[in-house]
């Protein structure tokens, strides 16, 4: 309720991009963050790729906190999973079904539980867990599917402090019909991923970024 009130107040000259509710349990000196995070964002001020996909009749599936980040606008079928395990399970379910043309998954544990908390061992174990599950995701892909693995920012658990860090993000793109081993180079903008998704699903040129589809 406090964050909802803050979101209603922080508009106009006092506008902030996002109010984040991060509930904790425990007592003084021994608090533990729960998985019941919610993000109260500002509605996007311009067209997003989710808007474009909706206009073209494509179904988006939003897994994790995606629905909150995009302020529930054209997020399609929203599955608000709370951790990496549930996010991977949901992604597998929708890959194997027929609900989505575009499956948009956020796995929050890397950032929330380990990066910001400087938990190197936990981060390593989370990476190992995802690596172990990745073959299942790849096996569930169909001919013509394209999977892009990336991050929205760095969050190095070994770096002093608890804020985001400034590494270049990784981009891995793969699919049954795609030849592997092609270097994508150092991209100039995060928007290249959006441009690639739009070209792949609609054949259209996105107004930001450059597609690396070819």
Protein language model regions, located:
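Feature captures the catalytic ectodomains and active-site-proximal regions of enzymes
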Residues: 1-214
């Amino acid at each position: 309720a406090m964050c909802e009130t803050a979101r209603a107040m922080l508009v106009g000259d006092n506008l902030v991009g996002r109010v984040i509710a991060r509930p904790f349990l425990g007592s003084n000196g021994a608090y533990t963050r729960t998985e019941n995070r919610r993000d109260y964002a500002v509605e996007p001020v311009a067209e997003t790729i989710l808007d474009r996909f909706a206009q073209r009749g494509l179904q988006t599936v939003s897994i994790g906190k995606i629905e909150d980040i995009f302020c529930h606008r054209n997020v399609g079928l929203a599955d608000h999973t709370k951790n990496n395990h549930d996010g991977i399970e949901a992604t597998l379910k929708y890959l194997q079904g027929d609900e989505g043309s575009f499956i948009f998954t956020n796995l929050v544990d890397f950032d929330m539980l380990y990066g910001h908390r400087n938990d190197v061992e936990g981060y390593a174990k989370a990476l190992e867990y995802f690596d172990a599950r990745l073959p299942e995701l790849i096996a569930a892909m169909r001919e013509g599917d394209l999977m892009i693995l990336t991050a929205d920012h760095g969050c190095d658990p070994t770096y002093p402090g608890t804020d985001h860090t400034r590494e270049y993000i990784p981009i891995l793109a793969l699919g049954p019909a795609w030849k592997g081993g092609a270097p994508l180079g150092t991209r100039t903008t995060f928007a290249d991923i959006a441009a690639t998704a739009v070209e792949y699903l609609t054949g259209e040129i996105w107004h930001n970024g450059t597609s690396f589809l070819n």
